[in-house]
UniProtKB/Swiss-Prot annotation:
Species the sequence originates in: Methanococcus vannielii (strain ATCC 35089 / DSM 1224 / JCM 13029 / OCM 148 / SB)
Record note on cofactor: Binds 1 zinc ion.
One GO MF term attached to the UniProt entry: zinc ion binding
Domain of life: Archaea
Catalytic activities: RNA(n) + a ribonucleoside 5'-triphosphate = RNA(n+1) + diphosphate
NCBIfam families: PRK04016.1
GO cellular component terms attached to this protein's record: cytoplasm; DNA-directed RNA polymerase complex
Lineage: Archaea, Methanobacteriati, Methanobacteriota, Methanomada group, Methanococci
Protein name: DNA-directed RNA polymerase subunit Rpo10
Database matches in PROSITE patterns: RNA_POL_N_8KD
Enzyme Commission (EC) number: 2.7.7.6
Length: 68
């Protein structure tokens, strides 16, 4: 699934910090620390990052595209 532009609950724009989140996550930083530094404070917005699958720097979308 492609990362959403806005939080589903409150509507805040969250995609603007996603690239930095993804980069820092690959550098083995804690997700809690990253989101605090990026200013993502609402639980609903943090949920959007926590529930988005990232494995070895790849998203679920990257796996699905291979079977197109």
């Amino acid at each position: 699934m492609i990362f959403p532009i806005r939080c589903f609950s409150c509507g805040n724009v969250i995609s603007e910090v996603y690239d930095e989140y993804k980069t820092r996550l690959s550098n083995v930083e804690s997700p809690e620390e990253i989101l605090n530094d990026l200013g993502v404070t609402k639980y609903c917005c943090r949920r959007m990052f926590a529930s988005h699958r990232l494995e070895n720097g790849k998203e679920l979308f990257d796996d699905i595209v291979e079977y197109r």
